[in-house]
Amino acid sequence: VFQRGSTMHSLVPRDENGRSNYRMGALRPNQFGIDDAHVVEYVESIAQASGEFLQIVNFNLAGQQYAVAGTVAGLKALEEDAAKRAAEHGGKRPFMYVPGIDVPFHSTVLRSGVADFRTNLDERIPAEIDPAKLVGRYIPNLVARPFELTREFAQSILDVVPSETVRVLLEVPGAWDAALANPGALTRTLLIELLCWQFASPVRWIETQRVLLSTEEAAPGVAGLGVDQVIEVGLGAAPTLANLASRTLLAPDFARSRVEVFNVQRDGSRVYATDVAVIEDEDEEEIAPATDP
């Protein structure tokens, strides 16, 4: 995490006072009538009209919460347009700046740092990784589908980022089959590509939650896992992911879901099953029926 953060910060130009030209804000498109299916198009239209960089970098809650990275001027244009639309629509404040953020995290602006971050990962990750630890258990936000050692999964990486490593695996004759002969090494290769490109790609949490919570197909070709419990490992005072899961489960798509949502610190007694009262055995003499004299 430290290496990733350091690399991200080093990629952003700063003036003599240490200030960058980037900020981040939270957008609530439901306040002005834009739904999840059209929010990307909306943000792109503001970027094009203003001539400034804007990108949704965190897809948090369908229709309701998106983090947008952009230039100072770009976010100003987005703020003004969203406010105008919300006023016309009768909605509440649709845009707020995220304080203290001046790096366009998870945006394409950082793609020039992917190679350096890959090198950092390569130096720190073991030569082989047991596939059983990741296959069907790890859902990378880069692709928002469970990890697999399949050509289809590798292609899903190439569908969103120009990974030369994955391109060679898929397009050079015999390369995929040769790599598959050593599953531990292939798992490592794909993991490194997923992590280094996630560094400069949006967090697709809406789709990831859909995979976790859906009992049917979560996306074309991607089966839902249908979990019955979500346990966030994080601060109980700020249960961000638990709150997002709870709000997601209120959507009509999950009306029939019966998923329990916990934060490990806030709901520790439930998570560790220590909230059940223990009934001690009573002495035999106390439970024996009374007898006639």
Predicted regions span which residues?
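Alpha/beta catalytic cores of group-transfer enzymes, especially the acyltransferase/condensing modules
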Residues: 1-171, 176-179, 183
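Acyltransferase/transacylase module recognition
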Residues: 104, 108, 112, 119-292
